[in-house]
Regions:
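Class I SAM-dependent methyltransferase Rossmann-like catalytic core
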Residues: 1-18
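Short alpha-helix
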Residues: 158-174
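Conserved alpha-helix/loop element of class I SAM-dependent methyltransferases that forms part
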Residues: 14-34, 44-48
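A short glycine-rich, Lys/Arg-flanked "PGG" loop and its adjoining helix->strand segment in the class I
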Residues: 113-125
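A short SAM/SAH-binding and catalytic strip from SAM-dependent methyltransferases
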Residues: 98-111
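Conserved beta-strand signature within the Rossmann-like core of class I S-adenosyl-L-methionine
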Residues: 126-134
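Class I SAM-dependent methyltransferase SAM/SAH-binding core
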Residues: 36-38, 42-89
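A short acidic, Gly/Pro-enriched loop at the edge of an enzyme's catalytic core
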Residues: 88-100
Length: 174
């Protein structure tokens, strides 16, 4: 019940804040063509995609708050296709997308390295990967606290990891 109803509403409320909306607008400004979004959630990115986006395909392992998703999808300026599958095995052809997007998702994917490799596979040769994530701090004091708090965070935030080195994972995936 918590993971299905309470946590998604809490995250939708937190991530709707103006600071996050500003970050989304900046992140998504270069998106164009056919876009793959990893971790659709409740669709908070939808209003921030530019007019250069012609279609959005998204993967998310579980449906979240279908009423909010339906409302946001209905307001989109382009077709939106959502599949409830894992990001580690994307059900798309090689080089199918002009752009891929991930916002606050790589922290929860069980095998982010596999997901990033598969994202690279489905991107066209000159495709762009746009991401907005949190991860392990470079400050050793903060990093130690992230390590200490990670088990609790993982439990209360439905699999979110505070201490992943997202930047390194992205670089390693190419």
């Amino acid at each position: 019940m918590y993971a299905t109803y309470i946590f998604p509403r809490l995250m939708d409320w937190v991530l709707r804040g103006e600071r996050f909306q500003t970050e989304r607008r900046h992140l998504l400004a270069p998106a164009q063509g056919v876009v793959l979004e990893i971790g659709f959630g409740t669709g908070l990115n939808l209003p921030h995609y530019p007019r250069t986006v012609t279609a959005l395909h998204s993967v998310d392992p579980a449906p979240l708050l279908p009423d909010r998703v339906a409302r946001r999808v209905a307001q989109a300026a382009f077709p939106v296709h959502i599949r409830h599958v894992s990001a580690e095995r994307l059900p798309y052809d090689d080089a199918a997308f002009d752009c891929a997007v991930s916002t606050f998702t790589l922290c929860t994917i069980p095998d982010p390295a596999s997901a990033l490799r598969d994202i690279r596979r489905v991107l066209k040769p000159n495709g762009r990967f746009l991401f907005l994530e949190h991860g392990r701090s470079d400050d050793p004091v903060i990093a130690r606290w992230q390590d200490r708090l990670n088990p609790l965070q993982n439990l209360v935030a439905c699999g979110c990891n505070l201490n992943r080195r997202i930047d390194q994972l992205v670089l390693d995936a190419g």
